[in-house]
Amino acid sequence: MKRIIRNLALVCAAVLALASCNQEKTRKALLPNITGTAGEVIVVIGQNDWEGAVGTVLRDSLSREFPQLPQREPMFNLVNVPQAAFTSMFQVHRNIIVVNISKDVTEPGVLYRNDVWAAPQTVIRVNAPDSETAVQLIKENCTIIIGMLEEAERARMIRNAKKYEERNIATAVNEMVGGSPHFPSGYKLKKRTDDFIWVSYDPEYVSQGILIYKYPVVEGEDMMSPESLLAANSKMLMENVPGMFENTYMIMSSYAQPTVKYMKYHGLQFAEIRGLWEVHNDYMGGPFVSHVFYSPDGQEVIVLQGFVYAPKYDKRQYLRQVESIVYSFEWAKNEKENEKD
């Protein structure tokens, strides 16, 4: 009898969980689309706190300089909205930080939620009993807050790329390296060899490029050391990315030393290179970002490099767009996995 009751309880719990899940899916499906421009964050906070220590730490954290751009640009553009003005017009914004400072707060902390008033939306709430606690919470959670906002923007761009994908390009890249990023509509295959592919999107006054290449692992050499990575990149650029005139080709700029970080994203371990590029014997240049990782069998090094040329415009958003393509890389599914799908 006890076993029957226990089984019935489990069934009821499962049914309730399924119903709750379905209700949440229905709720999200009915939400309006987000508003606001990419890289913009609404900060809901009182004017005094915005102009005081809390606003200062938010600006220092979120408006810090975006790394490795030719000119200064902030990580995010912050827009202050007082609590009284936070109406439905602002509630559908893509990125929202609500700073709730009240002596009634008994559990200080930072809460993260998605799709509260619109979709796909990120809402971050800082609850604190006073301004000093709010400042401390923001400092302690700064890296997570930035990561959440960056991932939200990246996920939106990847979702769009998958929805409007140039599948013929992915097929070519798959054949060369066994996987591919997702290229959104408008990108074209510009150059292809056995170990190098150049994909480009070239609207007026802007060029966004993705370079995909591979080279063999040399036994006994640390292929992922900064020195090895930068040397391989320089060689590839000189051999495969010519400029507009004779004896011109892409190089890494000496204006700023490239940075190398080792990261992991969705199970893929890679080295991230950020820096500036220029054209030898010419006056073109811009930012780039690369992800470098091993092939599944460990016999080859694979590189995905996104770069931007936009002399008339700010570069941050253009770079984030090509970076999202690089982040969207997935290994090709085998036949058995395709059958399951």
Where are these regions (language model features)?
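Short Lys/Arg-enriched alpha/beta "domain-start" segment
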Residues: 36-70
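Surface-exposed amphipathic alpha-helical segments
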Residues: 135-159, 187, 299-341
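Bacterial N-terminal signal peptides that target proteins for export
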Residues: 1-9
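A short acidic-to-branched-hydrophobic micro-motif
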Residues: 42-45, 204-233
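Bacterial signal peptide processing site
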Residues: 22-25
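Proline-anchored loop/turn motifs at beta-strand termini and strand-loop-strand connectors
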Residues: 177-193
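C-terminal motif of bacterial Sec signal peptides marking the signal peptidase cleavage site
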Residues: 18-20
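Signature of long, low-cysteine stretches enriched in small and polar/charged residues
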Residues: 74, 81-132, 238-298, 313
